């Protein structure tokens, strides 16, 4: 680290942090559990707590095996690389998918894969018809890169992918010898809200990456699940990409505490708060980009003409942290902060009526301006 770099204030609470559900902090119970974690070498498959967590999550998802990764990005990239064998090939996904938009071109660099990003015709989630329209068959045409994997994200932008649509897509993938991967970073949320067990989702996919941090509240990690054969090969790519962790037992023991707790109750609490904010926005004419099925509310900044930086600064005025038009909820958000963020959004919306913001440029979730402003939470006056 640069010795001249100014350090941020110590992070103490996520109760007012709406930037992402990744900002949940480990509980005292998790930290205490880490003190009793096993200390075997997980790269050599000798750490008991790591093996227990991998087996437990795999069982929950109805899969044969699991593999601990330090992040969802790593588990996604390893999964897709494992499914792919000989280029040229392509991966089909939603145009908003994390594997396409927020994993630093990993598919192109690590898997040498072309990506076919698809805009859902219904505006919310991909249907079988959307996939068929953009699918590139392996029919001998040497000009294209045949589709080999369909990658779906559940939830995506907080939207639950309907089970009946997943069933249709799975059947078609089997007919066409295609692999089906799920970026299940927030599949816990989908399961808690829809009532669909993780095991039922697991029956529909060849692999799922399941995040342990985000709303679940563990400090880090993701479990990639699939068949024994798949995970054995995935472990090879994890090693290649520098993802082997030695004493991962501490992280896995902390994650197990989260999973064995009332995670469904935690998820549903965050969903209730998001639904309440969505109703508040509807009552005040504040447009949303998409349905608030679970723990995200996406404000439609284009329709509302809200300046995202004004929105961030209004939030700071009320002691809340926000990053652009995406409002993320997690179980550690306080009721008081919910009321404050409502007022911040309403003030930004009223401001936009007199000062409409219309910028022709890329829309970014992770805005550097917003990140800089959040750092001023203790001193900013607006």
Swiss-Prot record:
InterPro entries: ArAA_b-elim_lyase/Thr_aldolase, Low_specificity_L-TA-like, PyrdxlP-dep_Trfase, PyrdxlP-dep_Trfase_major, PyrdxlP-dep_Trfase_small. It comes from the Eukaryota. Pfam families: Beta_elim_lyase. Signal peptide: none annotated. Coiled coil: none annotated. GO terms for molecular function: L-allo-threonine aldolase activity. Pathway: Amino-acid degradation; L-threonine degradation via aldolase pathway; acetaldehyde and glycine from L-threonine: step 1/1. One of its GO terms (biological process) is glycine biosynthetic process. Keywords: Lyase, Pyridoxal phosphate. Its EC number is 4.1.2.48. It catalyses: L-threonine = acetaldehyde + glycine; L-allo-threonine = acetaldehyde + glycine. Its cofactor is pyridoxal 5'-phosphate. GO terms for cellular component: cytosol. It is an enzyme of class 4 (lyase). The keyword Transmembrane helix does not apply. The modification N6-(pyridoxal phosphate)lysine is found at residue 214. Belongs to the threonine aldolase family. Homotetramer. This is Low-specificity L-threonine aldolase. It comes from Eremothecium gossypii (strain ATCC 10895 / CBS 109.51 / FGSC 9923 / NRRL Y-1056).
């Amino acid at each position: 680290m640069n010795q001249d770099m100014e350090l941020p204030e110590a992070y103490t609470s996520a109760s007012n942090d709406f930037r992402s559900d990744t900002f949940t902090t480990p509980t005292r119970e998790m930290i205490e559990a880490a003190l009793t974690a096993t200390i075997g070498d997980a790269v050599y498959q000798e750490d008991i707590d790591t093996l227990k967590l991998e087996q437990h999550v795999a069982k929950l998802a109805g899969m044969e095996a699991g593999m601990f990764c330090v992040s969802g990005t790593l588990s996604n990239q390893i999964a897709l690389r494992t499914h792919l064998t000989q280029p040229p090939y392509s991966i089909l996904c939603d145009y908003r998918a994390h594997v396409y938009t927020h994993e630093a071109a990993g598919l192109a660099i690590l898997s040498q894969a072309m990506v076919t990003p698809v805009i859902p015709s219904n505006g919310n989630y991909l249907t079988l018809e959307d996939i068929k329209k953009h699918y590139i068959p392996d029919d001998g045409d040497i000009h294209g890169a045949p589709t080999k994997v369909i990658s779906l994200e559940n939830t995506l932008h907080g939207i639950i992918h309907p089970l009946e649509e997943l069933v249709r897509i799975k059947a078609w993938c089997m007919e066409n010898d295609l692999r089906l991967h799920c970026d299940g970073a927030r599949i816990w949320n989908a399961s808690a809200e829809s009532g669909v067990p993780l095991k039922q989702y697991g029956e529909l996919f060849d692999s799922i990456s399941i995040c342990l941090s985000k709303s679940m509240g563990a400090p880090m990690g993701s479990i990639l699940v699939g068949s024994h054969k798949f995970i054995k090969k995935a472990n090879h790519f994890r090693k290649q990409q520098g993802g082997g962790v030695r004493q991962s037992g501490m992280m896995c023991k902390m994650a197990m505490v989260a999973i064995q707790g009332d995670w469904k109750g935690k998820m549903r609490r965050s969903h209730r708060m998001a639904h309440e904010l969505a109703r508040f926005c509807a009552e005040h004419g504040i447009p949303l980009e998409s349905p608030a099925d679970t723990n995200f509310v996406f404000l439609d900044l284009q329709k509302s003409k809200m300046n995202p930086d004004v929105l961030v600064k209004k939030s700071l005025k009320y002691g809340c942290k926000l990053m652009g038009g995406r409002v993320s909820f997690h179980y550690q958000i306080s009721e008081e902060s919910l009321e404050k963020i409502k007022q911040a959004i309403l003030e930004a919306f009223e401001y936009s009526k007199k000062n409409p913001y219309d910028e022709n440029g890329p829309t970014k979730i992770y805005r550097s301006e917003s990140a800089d402003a959040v750092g001023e939470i203790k001193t900013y006056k607006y």
